[in-house]
């Protein structure tokens, strides 16, 4: 008879090796591929950091804000700004900043599960979530190169951890701890509400989910929702933080003359609605890298098939399972998180279909919530059934990881390497333009940003 503890440790060692390997792969991709996958958004933030460095102003006068308004001390922008004092290489500063933010995200994933699960299996939960997040899909550019959407997950995790401690029944026994927790909650919700996107997909769904859970807890008696001092205080602080954040955002946008805001988002007409729906479905498959015009019997074809299975589990099976499974519970944090995530996902999908905000990048928050649901779903299967189910789950994850990273090396890293070799041998377009004094006349505004940074 095989030893159960030995089999258990082998399974966990295999999963641990896959997680560590995935983390090292992400570090390599960030350091090696960022320059090859550089785009105008990254150029904008680096140019802003350079202007901040030279002017000594966090919001330089006359700077053209096209991608967004950075918030002091709570974005990777401040890390790049500080690194510029010791490093002159713009892109390297950006890469180091993204590595720091990514490490912070991984740490918060572990802290989140240790807080809400509080058992040894929290490490297993964190490992599976990190493993799924590191799978090479179309979310990579926004997550690990631009770093634009990592902060959404970071702020959500911080908010959930603080909220969990606030809702613990023992929290009001220590007055100082209570004040600090509510102050932390106010600050986090305030800064989230200073971004219209975060207000719509995080702050508002969060407060709405809290009120809905409270409504259920009092057996659907509306007049009893605010019967406790904690509920009244929590609601007042929440709406105050959201309102102040909303006002502060527009005040800041006006101060820096932001060229475009989410206020420019409009509803689409009936003639465009069906096209938006088709675009949304296409974006979902694209985001999970579940579509590709390639041979079925190739590493890319196999990876595409595996990604389709992941899409089905992540986007359909696990969210529905979570709603059914945790919806039956009463007063649990995971029930609250499920309701919050469903409301947030619904709003994102609604805006992607019924408004002009149909870019695939908006799907990132839905993708993130589905990773959490998938982790909980897989752990449930592993715990409910015998060890052989655990072996099947871990082996499937490891196969997906190996195929995904191998395909990424072939389809993305290899062409970037060829690009670097060609640039080393033949020079770059920027070098040619500078050698011939052609410093103006770039093809477009975005290319001007891109080329200027890459020429540094």
Language model: regions and residue ranges:
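Signature aromatic-anchored transmembrane alpha helix within multi-pass, membrane-resident enzymes
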Residues: 11-22, 176, 180-184, 236-240, ...
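Transmembrane-helix motifs of polytopic, lipid-linked glycan transferases
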Residues: 20-24, 96-120, 158, 316-321
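Membrane-interface micro-motifs in multi-pass membrane enzymes
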Residues: 69, 73, 120-167, 358-370, ...
């Amino acid at each position: 008879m095989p030893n159960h503890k030995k089999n258990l440790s082998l399974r966990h060692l295999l999963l641990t090796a896959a997680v560590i390997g995935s983390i090292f792969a992400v570090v390599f991709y960030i350091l090696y591929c960022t320059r090859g996958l550089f785009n105008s958004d990254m150029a904008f933030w680096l140019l802003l950091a350079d202007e901040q460095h030279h002017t000594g102003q966090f919001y330089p006068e006359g700077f053209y804000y096209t991608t967004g308004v950075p918030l002091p001390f709570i974005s990777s922008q401040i890390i790049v700004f500080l690194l510029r004092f010791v490093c002159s290489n713009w892109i390297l500063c950006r890469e180091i900043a993204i590595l720091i933010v990514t490490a912070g995200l991984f740490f918060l994933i572990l802290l989140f599960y240790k807080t809400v699960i509080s058992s040894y299996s929290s490490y297993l939960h964190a490992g599976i979530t990190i493993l799924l997040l590191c799978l090479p899909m179309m979310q990579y550019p926004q997550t690990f190169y631009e770093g634009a959407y990592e902060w959404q997950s970071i702020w959500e995790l911080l908010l959930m951890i603080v909220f969990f401690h606030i809702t613990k029944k023992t929290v009001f026994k220590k007055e100082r701890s209570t004040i600090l927790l509510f102050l932390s909650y106010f600050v986090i919700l305030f800064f989230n509400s200073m971004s219209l996107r975060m207000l719509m997909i995080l702050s508002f769904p969060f407060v709405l989910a809290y009120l809905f859970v409270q409504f259920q807890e009092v057996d659907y008696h509306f007049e009893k929702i605010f019967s406790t001092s904690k509920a009244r205080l929590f609601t007042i602080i929440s709406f105050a933080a959201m309102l102040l954040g909303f006002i502060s955002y527009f005040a800041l946008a006006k101060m820096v003359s932001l060229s475009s805001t989410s206020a420019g988002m409009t509803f689409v007409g009936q003639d465009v609605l069906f096209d938006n729906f088709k675009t949304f479905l296409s974006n979902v498959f694209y985001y999970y890298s579940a579509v590709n015009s390639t041979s079925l019997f190739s590493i890319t074809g196999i990876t595409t098939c595996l990604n389709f299975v992941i899409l089905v589990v992540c986007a359909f099976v696990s969210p529905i399972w979570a709603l059914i499974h945790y919806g039956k519970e009463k007063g649990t944090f995971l029930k609250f998180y499920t309701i919050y995530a469903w409301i947030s996902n619904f709003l994102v999908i609604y805006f992607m279909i019924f408004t002009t905000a149909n870019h695939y990048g908006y799907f990132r928050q839905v993708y993130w919530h589905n990773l959490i649901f998938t982790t909980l779903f897989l752990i449930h299967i592993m715990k409910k059934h015998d060890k052989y189910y655990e072996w099947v789950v871990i082996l499937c994850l490891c196969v997906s990881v190996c195929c995904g990273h191998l395909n990424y090396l072939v389809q993305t890293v290899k062409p970037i390497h060829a690009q670097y070799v060609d640039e080393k041998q033949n020079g770059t377009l920027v070098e040619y333009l500078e050698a011939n004094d052609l410093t103006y006349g770039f093809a477009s505004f975005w290319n001007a940003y891109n080329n200027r940074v890459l020429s540094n």
